[in-house]
Amino acid sequence: MSRKTIFRVFILLFFFIGGQMSVNAQTTTPFETVFDACKKACEALDGGFASGEQLLAVSKTLRDAAPIPLTVKQTQGDVLSLKGHLVFDYEFIQACVDNETIYEIADKYAAEARMRGDKDSANKVRLDTKMVAAGQTCTFEIPSCSGTSQIGCVAEVNRSFSWKIKTIGYQSKSEREYKCNDSVRKGLPFRKEKVSSDERYKIIVSITNKSKRDGSFALILF
């Protein structure tokens, strides 16, 4: 193969790879951005040693994505304090870099995050942090959804969960359940699902903490 041919092949590969990277970047949805940031926050804190550089990068990603508060009504399970647990919020994650005692005032950060942004904004990712006791199940109701919604959950470090999801139409009262596979029933650190309906509906999410310790969980909706 001549040098000229090799050069042409190299140029073609360069533009092909660049094009693929551009397509991938363009297809990253706001939901995926927030979902992945929550996962990376846990990765940065895994093993008990926080990576300051990673945490700052995650904090910036969440700040730029600007998720708004997710309106959630807890209908089953104990309502626990977030004290001592991870809050999936850019200010809390940034504070983790320099302040090891930040977990003691986790509830304060969670409350402030729920006041940030306009809850009525359309086409925005919604995010909240919830607690589930070890081995217990909490059920949450997310109202006023329409069309196709993407829902995700990310457990804090060293936690796993299973979940059940169903939608209930406001007008027809019809229910649709989204089945979990075996791996989900045994417990996973994160999970996502798409749900849809031809009418306005609410989403019922039941999260079972499969861990032996209480845990915080990010609930994400888009």
Q: What do these predicted ranges mean?
A:
Residues 1-8:
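Positively charged n-region of N-terminal signal peptides that target proteins for export
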Residues 9-19:
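Bacterial N-terminal signal peptides
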Residues 23-27:
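Boundary at the C-terminal end of the N-terminal hydrophobic targeting segment
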Residues 29-51:
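Start-of-domain marker
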Residues 32, 130-214:
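Acidic, Ser/Thr/Pro-rich low-complexity intrinsically disordered segments
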Residues 44-54, 67-74:
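Charged, low-complexity interaction regions
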Residues 64-141:
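Non-catalytic extracellular/lumenal accessory regions of secreted precursors
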Residues 105-121, 201-222:
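C-terminal edge strands of extracellular/lumenal beta-sandwich accessory domains
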